């Protein structure tokens, strides 16, 4: 199961500068592994439509398994020619960076040798939740991240860990441990919260706490939470930037990619930076996209979903979050721990993330591409047609040749019409419609 594909600068075996393809994937043990391939210069191209005279020339098909050219039953060479999916002539155009579909063709060309990168394996995941300082104006905007992070909860059975910039006595730490052990038994008679070992990590400053948190998650395969990308991770990222913390070290290539969150009900798109080759995801987004277990979704809060999936709710409290933190800190820490413990068990019961992992594996695409609507279709088409020596060609038009045809748009037909109608089902291209 592919996490990310990335092209980085390198020195090729012949001593010249070029590109190297790095593919991160999840192995059978749930850990991150890498495929690295210096891309030969003759492979640095994209396909363009051509005439018969300028087209890529025919060639004799080669059998890589047996290291010989292929012939038919009559002993004649089997001749092939690369063409577009619509059976038109094409040619190669040199590029400095391969487009996504060319990367997919490259992986297809490796045959069964790369089958392990497409296996459906479950990543080792830590569940995360943060609590921030709250002012009289309410909760801070994660894009501004104007107040410090108070605590960070990380859970993966049998550990539940709190990173905190406020200390907690040993006696109160033991109280939290006891409350965790008994929480599910007291609320629904189960043992789902029993067996977790509570660990408390105190730091004198928020910067020290965030540095330790980043150090802790560097070797982790996956980290997830509820509404995690749009709040928790975005908040952590922005607070790290404010403190000058090197968050890029989360990626082995020290590079970041962007995950875009667009609210379905409108609003501005949020661009969230995610390190290459690490799985950082939002279980709320996964749940809203693929869950079919909870039939009636009154709302998408963690409290509601936990009550339906586990028959247990979040820790109830009567205080405002400012008072909660300042005057009832041990309960505050306990509250933070239970959120991540419940989320871990929601995943075990609903198994919604496995649908996401399965789609990425079966469709042979990156994990986050599975959230898209168009890209997966292109990749599936590419995978299907490549063995037939057919490819998808970039036919982008500009200027007067441009058309409006797209994913859900019919070709424009110039003419005079008496009646014109338009149907907008959560318009994908709202910015253009304006």
What spans do the regions from the language model cover?
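Conserved RNase H-like, two-metal-ion catalytic cores of nucleic-acid enzymes
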Residues: 3-61, 68, 102-222, 409-413
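Extended, Lys/Arg-enriched charged tracts that mediate electrostatic binding to polyanionic substrates
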Residues: 106-137, 247, 251-273, 382-399
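Short, well-ordered loop/turn elements at secondary-structure boundaries
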Residues: 120-122, 147-148, 217-222, 230, ...
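Residues immediately flanking
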Residues: 128-132, 228, 283, 423-425, ...
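Short helix/loop capping segments that flank catalytic or ligand/cofactor-binding pockets
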Residues: 135-138, 162-164, 233-234, 289-291, ...
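Conserved DEDDh/DEDDy metal-dependent 3′-5′ exonuclease domain
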Residues: 153, 163-297
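Hydrophobic, small-residue-rich alpha-helical packing segments that form membrane-like cores
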Residues: 238-352, 359-364
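Common nucleic-acid-contacting/processivity interface regions adjacent to the catalytic cores
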Residues: 320-434
């Amino acid at each position: 199961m592919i996490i990310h594909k990335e092209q980085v600068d390198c020195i090729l075996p012949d001593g010249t500068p070029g590109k190297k393809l790095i593919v991160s994937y999840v192995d059978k043990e749930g850990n991150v592994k890498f495929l690295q391939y210096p891309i030969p210069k003759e492979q640095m191209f994209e396909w363009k439509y051509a005439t018969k005279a300028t087209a890529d020339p025919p060639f004799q098909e080669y059998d890589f398994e047996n290291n010989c050219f292929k012939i038919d039953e009559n002993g004649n060479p089997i001749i092939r020619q690369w063409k577009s999916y619509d059976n038109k002539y094409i040619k190669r155009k040199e590029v400095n960076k391969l487009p996504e579909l060319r990367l997919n063709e490259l992986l297809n060309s490796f045959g069964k040798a790369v089958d392990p990168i497409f296996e459906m394996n479950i990543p080792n995941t830590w569940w995360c939740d943060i609590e921030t300082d709250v002012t009289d104006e309410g909760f801070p905007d994660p894009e501004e991240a104007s107040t410090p992070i108070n605590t960070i909860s990380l859970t993966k059975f049998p550990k539940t860990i709190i990173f905190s910039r406020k200390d907690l006595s040993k006696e109160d730490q033991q109280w939290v441990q006891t409350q965790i052990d008994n929480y599910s038994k007291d609320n629904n008679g189960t043992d789902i919260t029993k067996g977790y070992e509570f660990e408390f990590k105190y730091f004198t400053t928020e910067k020290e706490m965030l540095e330790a948190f980043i150090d802790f998650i560097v070797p982790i395969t996956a980290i997830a939470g509820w509404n995690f990308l749009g709040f928790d991770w975005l908040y952590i990222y922005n607070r790290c930037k404010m403190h000058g913390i090197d968050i890029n070290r989360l990626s082995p290539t020290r590079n970041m990619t962007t995950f875009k969150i667009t609210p379905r009900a409108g609003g501005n798109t949020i661009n969230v930076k995610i390190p290459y080759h690490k799985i950082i995801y939002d279980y709320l987004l996964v749940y809203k996209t693929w869950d079919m277990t909870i039939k009636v979704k009154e709302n998408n809060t963690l409290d509601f979903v936990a009550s339906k999936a586990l028959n247990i709710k979040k820790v109830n409290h009567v205080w405002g979050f400012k008072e909660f933190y300042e005057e009832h800190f041990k309960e505050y820490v306990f509250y933070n721990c239970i959120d991540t413990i419940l989320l871990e068990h929601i995943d075990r019961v609903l198994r919604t993330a496995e649908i996401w992992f399965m789609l990425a594996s079966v469709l042979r695409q990156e994990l986050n591409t599975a959230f898209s609507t168009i890209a997966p279709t292109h990749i599936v088409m590419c995978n299907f047609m490549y063995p037939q020596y057919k490819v998808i060609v970039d036919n982008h038009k500009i200027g007067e040749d441009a058309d409006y045809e797209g994913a859900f748009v019919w070709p424009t037909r110039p003419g005079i019409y008496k009646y014109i109608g338009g149907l907008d089902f959560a318009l994908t291209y709202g910015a253009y419609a304006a």
